[in-house]
């Protein structure tokens, strides 16, 4: 049996560019890609916190240290500059891999400042 699990997440990153006339994709600060373990051209899901849009695209590398999140091509209709987004990558894991799997999560503060990283989401309480 295999399960599709969260591999990596950038939580509440701010869209810095929305470029309609660009080949499709999402450019992400290269340092963040490395920290999250997301590969260039890897499929990602983007969830727009501000307007509720959810869409699929792929990651491309932006300049290291740029703090860039650029939503490009047709996806630019779904996210505008200033929108807060959650970017996720998922992967298939075997039963054996599930026992030790931990996602890589990057949490962003305003201005796309990396606040902290984690490999677990706290238990939600009432």
From Swiss-Prot:
Per the record, the pathway is: Cofactor biosynthesis; (R)-pantothenate biosynthesis; beta-alanine from L-aspartate: step 1/1
**The keyword Cytoplasm is annotated on this UniProt entry:** yes
Q: Where, by residue number, does substrate bind?
A: 57, 73-75
Q: Which reaction does it catalyse?
A: L-aspartate + H(+) = beta-alanine + CO2
| Pfam families, A to Z | Asp_decarbox
Known role: Catalyzes the pyruvoyl-dependent decarboxylation of aspartate to produce beta-alanine.
Assembly and interaction partners: Heterooctamer of four alpha and four beta subunits.
Q: What is this protein called?
A: Aspartate 1-decarboxylase
Traced from the root, the source organism's taxonomic lineage reads: Bacteria, Pseudomonadati, Pseudomonadota, Gammaproteobacteria, Pseudomonadales
